[in-house]
Amino acid sequence: MIPLRLLFSTSYNPWFNLSLEEYIFKNMDQNQTILFLWRNQNTIVIGRSQNAWKECNTRRMNRDGVKLARRHSGGGAVFHDLGNTCFTFMSTQKNYNKNVSFKIILDGLNSLNISAKISGRNDLIINTNQGDRKISGSAYRQVSDRQLHHGTLLLNVDINKLSYYLNPDSKKLKSKGITSVNSRIINLNTLHANITHDLVCNQLKTAFFNYYQTTVESEIISIKNFNHIKDFSKQFNKQRSWQWNFGNTPSFSHYLDNRFNWGSVELHFDISHGMINRSHIFTDSLNPEPLEELSKKLIGISYNAVTIQHCCQEWTKNWPQFQELQEVTHWLITNVT
């Protein structure tokens, strides 16, 4: 048994990287510590108990091909691109805690003349002329005899995309999930113009080896290393599923209203586990029957654009004489997801 492992992922797929993290965490040897370094391309990663619709602009994400990935730890929503270095420390050693991994990260940054410090429970900050700025957020998880500490380092993240996709629509959502805390952030390339993912990984590797006073061969991991492993495939299929990423959302309500030329419509949704379990429509239309039927048809379907659009298409077939129903369909699809 090797007491240390150092892993690098060649994949930018968040579902693969989070599946790999979870698979290794569950199957690692006793008295072992692992550092896993990875990146995701254009992804929003949300905490285990967060509401995807509340945290993210899901319509923009769907249109632009930005992935949603729900992790197994708690905490808030984060935007990932290739300007982000992701780290995961996993250990089954009895004396391990996240202060160990924080020290390794801080030592690695210090070797680049970047002086950072811990803020609160899970953040790293640096002091600037504008005050303290966040460069890293992380989450900690402990299960039985093993611990996991993972997070991000902001090297050269596209700040515009971060605010574009993490800024939720002005939907009237009431959620029981955890809401992300907006923090003032800064990219490390403002302090170190030549900083790169490879450079940071190399410094973290050195700090990792120095802390444990030993070295090991790095392991370069790609999807092809794991696609034949049944347990991993099961984890990967779960990680990328709609049910895990959206269906695990805590219960919430959604209210919509609009004024059409022919009347006003108010729509109230209750959503649980990603499914619409209550729907009620109020209208002053002179022909309320079609809308009343739609309200009933929406109950029991999943809360996503494809199923809602299909439901509306079937609904309008029953009322071909009412052209205004096409307006309702377009409004609903545009505003719900």
From Swiss-Prot:
Ligand binding (ATP): 71, 76-79, 134
InterPro entries: aa-tRNA-synth_II/BPL/LPL, BPL_LPL_catalytic, Lipoate_ligase_A, Lipoate_protein_ligase_C, LipoylTrfase_LipoateP_Ligase
A single BP term in Gene Ontology: protein modification process
Top-tier EC class: ligase
Single Gene Ontology MF annotation: ATP binding
Key word Nucleotide-binding present: yes
Keyword Ligase: yes
Domain BPL/LPL catalytic residue range list: 29-216
Substrates-to-products reaction catalysed: L-lysyl-[lipoyl-carrier protein] + (R)-lipoate + ATP = N(6)-[(R)-lipoyl]-L-lysyl-[lipoyl-carrier protein] + AMP + diphosphate + H(+)
Record-listed (R)-lipoate binding positions: 134
Quaternary structure note: Monomer.
Stored PANTHER family: LIPOATE-PROTEIN LIGASE, LIPOYLTRANSFERASE 1, MITOCHONDRIAL
Annotated HAMAP family: LplA
Family: Belongs to the LplA family.
Protein name from the UniProt record: Lipoate-protein ligase A
Organism of origin: Blochmanniella floridana
Gene name linked to the record: lplA
